[in-house]
Amino acid sequence: MKILALKRKEQSVIPGFGLTFGISLTMLSILILIPLASILVYSFRLSPLEFWKLVTEKPVLNAFFTSVICSFIAAAVNCVFGVILAWVLIRYDFFGKRFLDGMLELPFALPTAVAGITLSKMYSDTGMVGKYFAKIGIKISYTHVGIIIALIFVGIPFVVRAVQPILEKLDNQYEEAAYILGADGKTTFWKVIFPEIRPALLTGFGLAFSRGLGEYGSVIYISGNSLKEHTQVVSYVIMQKLNYVDYPSATAIALLMLVISFILLFLINFVQMNQFKRTNNV
């Protein structure tokens, strides 16, 4: 009986499972489930034919294409530079390291509208950086390149923060053993380091891609939102539909975005679960 009592005591949770679960479920319902359910309920008013017609309009398809391609490119670039930045922050000590690490939180703390205005001015034809590209005929602001730069800015922390803990736990002995066995730096990275950080890198890629797909504030100022140049993104199209009180179109597009986001989250969780199982098996 004493053993059972001790076992029950170890399993108890303070302030109690019922209370904590109730609070969690209430907050989850208010902040996430109810708003998502309202989108689903409103979308049920549309017939399948009406829904298909709304989401396959040419401006909507162009916006989806722009958002997906630019988000994918930005997330891929973030994976490359995110790994490099995480490696530098973990493996080296240098002056200003803490400042650089803290600056990674800036995209989280800075209002996206402020970031968008700053980037659009900086990369305009007369801006601090854009004027040098303008001299060689390269336009950044109000183009797809500008959109990608904005998405890189808001997405880079997701990759770095996902990879950093893995690199921090990775023992240097694996690299030393590879070096002793005759492996060069390139082989060591691809055969020893990359397999360890790959799940975290995929997670960071998925999070950066998802953030880019739904980004609004930092993109609308630098994209130009031109129908002719196909620089409108999905979030801008949804806002435009709402401004014109076209709720059916806005709901249909939002629902499609919601489905894409859920698929991405499912894939991210699937990768994490597989990695967890592999780690436990080892």
Feature map (PLM): residue ranges:
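C-terminal transmembrane helix and the adjacent membrane-cytosol boundary/short C-terminal tail
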Residues: K2-L4, S12-P15, L19-I23, L31-I34, ...
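Transmembrane-helix boundary motif in ABC transporter permease subunits
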Residues: I3-S12, F72-L104, I117, K121, ...
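Membrane-interfacial helix termini and adjacent extracytoplasmic/periplasmic loops
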Residues: L4-E10, P48-T56, L61, K97, ...
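Periplasmic/extracellular loop-to-transmembrane helix junction in inner-membrane transport proteins
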Residues: K9-I14, G18, I39-A76, R91-Y92, ...
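Amphipathic cytosolic juxtamembrane alpha-helices at the membrane-cytosol interface
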Residues: E10-S12, F95-F99, H144-G146, L170-T203
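Interhelical loop and adjacent transmembrane-helix boundary motif
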Residues: S12-G16, K58, Y216-L267
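Transmembrane alpha-helices
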Residues: G22-M27, L106, F153-G155, V159-D171, ...
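Membrane-cytosol interface at the C-terminal ends of specific transmembrane alpha-helices
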Residues: I136-Y179, F205, F266, F270
